[in-house]
Every structure is written in structure tokens, then in C-alpha cells.
Amino acid sequence: MAVKDYYKVQGDSVTRIKQFCPRCGPGTFLADHKNRLTCGKCGYTEFKK
């Protein structure tokens, strides 16, 4: 996935689409699966409701 898929540009502002991993910190994004968010680096998993 390219970096452009992690951010959304609207006019002069840039917003982050994906969440950062709370364990690894900024720069490591969580993968968005059907029922969970997962970090590929440390294995952190957060289930969706």
C-alpha cells in the first residue's frame, strides 16, 4: 500500500486515515481488517464492536 492511501488531502489540510499503533507509536499504522485492527510489527490487536 502506498503512503497516499494513509492520508487524505482536502484543500490545505492533511488528515490521517489509518490509526497509529499505541504500543509502537507514531509511524506504525494498524491494518484495518473486517472485524479488527492489527499491528503487523508487534501483533497488537483491537477488535471492532
Curated annotation (Swiss-Prot):
GO biological process, one term: translation
UniProtKB keywords: Metal-binding, Ribonucleoprotein, Ribosomal protein, Zinc, Zinc-finger
Residue intervals passing through the bilayer: none
Chain positions recorded as Zn(2+) binding sites: C21, C24, C39, C42
Top-level taxon: Archaea
Note accompanying the cofactor annotation: Binds 1 zinc ion per subunit.
One protein family per Pfam: Ribosomal_S27
Cofactor: Zn(2+)
SUPFAM superfamilies: Zn-binding ribosomal proteins
InterPro entries according to UniProt: Ribosomal_eS31, Ribosomal_eS31_arc, Ribosomal_zn-bd
GO molecular function: structural constituent of ribosome; zinc ion binding
Span of zinc fingers (C4-type): 21-42
Any one GO cellular component localisation term in the record: ribonucleoprotein complex
Family to which the UniProt record says this protein belongs: Belongs to the eukaryotic ribosomal protein eS31 family.
Subunit note: Part of the 30S ribosomal subunit.
HAMAP family hit by this protein: Ribosomal_eS31
Record protein name field: Small ribosomal subunit protein eS31
Gene for this chain: rps27ae
